Amino acid sequence: MTNQTQLSSKTYDTHFAKLTAEQLAENAKKKVIIGMSGGVDSSVSAFILQQQGYQVEGLFMKNWEEDDDTDYCTAAADLADAQAVADKLGMKLHKINFAAEYWDNVFEHFLNEYKAGRTPNPDILCNKEIKFKAFLEYAAEDLGADYIATGHYVRRSGDDNNAQLLRGLDANKDQSYFLYTLSHKQVGQSLFPVGDIEKPIVRQIAEDLGLATAKKKDSTGICFIGERKFKDFLARYLPAQPGEIRTVDGKVVGRHDGLMYHTLGQRKGLGIGGVKGLSEDPFYVVEKDLINNVLVVAQGHDNSALLSSGLIATQLHWVDRQPIRENLRCTVKTRYRQTDIACEIQPIDDDTIRVIFDEPQIAVTPGQSAVFYQGDVCLGGGVIEEQLK
């Protein structure tokens, strides 16, 4: 096995401050278990931790049992890549199967939300239930970890007992939206080595080191769906109920295969051609009428039916675990990679808030998460219960 001290990266040396002998000695007392996904971000994160003097071991999590004939999750290939990187870095790689926990705590909730007509975000739930709960507990209790680490593009500030969650330095890759359910305690038990650098630098470090994952494509989509079509996947678990597509005025303009296949603000894939007596402006989904099984659409990107003045959110998680009891000015994202929206939080009770936007917003989607910020600090968030017109 390659000794970890033999590997070096000029790119790393350029972008990371050299630690003092005292800092290295202090870090050497700490054991870090890094979640190795078989991707470039966790691969480079492991190297960075080694350079910072920590005792580093990897853990590969298998969270989904594929069908034998349809290996969509590429788990075998990802494990092989994670093992190749671990071997290159001279690092032990543990393996664990969390498929049962994933099914019970992530996947069943995902299906139930779709049944209820909402559009859930399983990545957020996976981080909450698997990566920063099952993994964190296993690493601490079974592997003796002082910290866990992941390849997420986020940062932390403050000491371990009073840590804050910050956006990643790379605005294009910032993943704090997916981690808003973490408590300050969980953040304090976690390290995010690539949060302070930009993605191209991560790739360059991997190339410097000759890692197998250096040119590997970023994973897209939800793990358990992989590269297959979302519609085909969902149909295996939930019976579809076709119905009518109507305009806000009640005019029938088409048919849908099932409300669960559609989300608010959606334009593509509606299958509505030119409709006699209507303009050629594209149609957008503005409502899912569950009672009548009707998909309601409106024409034009700026149609007032698409706009929301705010939202109601529940299932709140604040990073500092202190409920908000007074009105608060901040910004919010109602979906990943959205530009921040200026808003005011108005608490209704400790688990429900009203959020009023400074400017009306399109496609505020029940089931998705609203995540709040003050500057770079992620305050926390909640699940959108309803949009306010």
Curated annotation (Swiss-Prot):
What is the top EC class of this enzyme, as a single word?
transferase
The active site annotation covers: 126 (nucleophile), 223 (cysteine persulfide intermediate)
What is the designated name of this protein? tRNA-specific 2-thiouridylase MnmA
Q: Which gene encodes it?
A: mnmA
- Record organism: Actinobacillus pleuropneumoniae serotype 3 (strain JL03)
Which cysteines are disulphide-bonded?
126-223
Lineage, broadest ranks? Bacteria, Pseudomonadati, Pseudomonadota, Gammaproteobacteria, Pasteurellales
Family, according to the entry, reads as follows: Belongs to the MnmA/TRMU family.
Q: What does this protein do?
A: Catalyzes the 2-thiolation of uridine at the wobble position (U34) of tRNA, leading to the formation of s(2)U34.
Q: Which reaction does it catalyse?
A: S-sulfanyl-L-cysteinyl-[protein] + uridine(34) in tRNA + AH2 + ATP = 2-thiouridine(34) in tRNA + L-cysteinyl-[protein] + A + AMP + diphosphate + H(+)
Region spans: Interaction with target base in tRNA: 121-123
